[in-house]
Amino acid sequence: MKFQYLLAVFLIVLVVTDHCQAFFSLLPSLIGGLVSAIKGRRRRQLEARFEPKQRNFRKRELDFEKLFANMPDY
């Protein structure tokens, strides 16, 4: 009978520690998000993440269309 209680307590402790670990690992990202929200920082725009030579997406798209138009169909 004591073994069943010991097993139940062990499983409860295991579940509680798992939830605590998940909660405490979430805290740093929450704190960072709150700090950036308070300071008013905005996320960078998508275009700022690309190198300057890659900014002209439409021109590259037209170049690919021209390239594929000249390729033979198999």
From Swiss-Prot:
Q: Signal sequence span per UniProt?
A: 1-22
Q: Where in the cell is it found?
A: Secreted; Target cell membrane
**Which parts of the sequence carry Lysine amide?**
K39
UniProt keyword list: Amidation, Antibiotic, Antimicrobial, Cleavage on pair of basic residues, Membrane, Secreted, Signal, Target cell membrane, Target membrane
| rRNA-binding keyword on record | no
Biological process according to GO: defense response to bacterium
User: Which positions does the propeptide occupy?
Assistant: 45-74
Q: What is the first-listed, main subcellular location in coarse terms? A: secreted
UniProt keyword annotation of Membrane present: yes
> What do the Gene Ontology cellular component annotations say?
extracellular region; membrane; other organism cell membrane
**Tissue expression per record:** Expressed by the venom gland.
The protein's superkingdom reads: Eukaryota
Q: Which family does it belong to?
A: Belongs to the non-disulfide-bridged peptide (NDBP) superfamily. Short antimicrobial peptide (group 4) family.
Q: What does this protein do?
A: Has potent antibacterial activity against Gram-positive bacteria M.luteus, B.thuringiensis, S.aureus and B.subtilis, but not Gram-negative bacteria. Shows a weak cytotoxicity effect against mammalian cell lines and relatively low hemolytic activity against human erythrocytes.
Additional info? A fragment comprising residues 4-17 has been detected in venom but it is unclear whether it has a physiological role or is simply due to degradation.
Protein name stated in the entry: Imcroporin
